[in-house]
């Protein structure tokens, strides 16, 4: 029988896309193209939080000390808060190369947004849709 490891794990949950399907008037925002056609929910799992924190600080130092990047307006914001949608491609490349070396696991769940299915399965309630996404994301993952 395999012995259970006793180590502390850390989970960071994030989403991408807009979970909305309809506006307040009941108009289908997905069909109109006013919101994303997919909604993604994911998490990062690690037991190396201190190492990852140091790596992120090293990334910020590398960006701060790169003379080429200093003239890019968005870099000042990146030094405070890294976020792929706001960071310039050069910063994203530095971050992605560093992520490859980190001790992390990522799990994602992607939903294609279908307004008819949303009405039938979730009674057009965003909270039920989000709850379903969370359940699917963590299904058979946490013990």
Describe the residue ranges of each PLM region.
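Phosphate-ester processing/binding pockets and catalytic centers
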Residues: 1-143
């Amino acid at each position: 029988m395999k012995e259970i490891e006793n180590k502390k794990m850390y989970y960071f949950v994030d989403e991408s896309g807009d979970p909305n399907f309809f506006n307040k008037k009941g108009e289908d925002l997905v069909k109109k193209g006013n919101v994303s056609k997919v909604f993604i929910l994911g998490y990062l799992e690690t037991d190396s939080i201190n190492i990852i924190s140091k790596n992120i600080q090293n990334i910020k130092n590398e960006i701060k000390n790169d003379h080429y990047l200093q003239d890019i307006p968005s870099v000042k914001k990146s030094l405070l808060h890294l976020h792929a949608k706001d960071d310039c491609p050069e910063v994203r490349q530095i971050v992605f190369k560093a992520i490859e070396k980190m001790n992390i696991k990522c799990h994602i769940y992607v939903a294609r947004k279908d307004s008819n299915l949303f009405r039938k399965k979730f009674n057009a309630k965003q909270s039920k849709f989000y709850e379903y996404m969370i359940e699917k994301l963590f299904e058979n993952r946490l013990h």
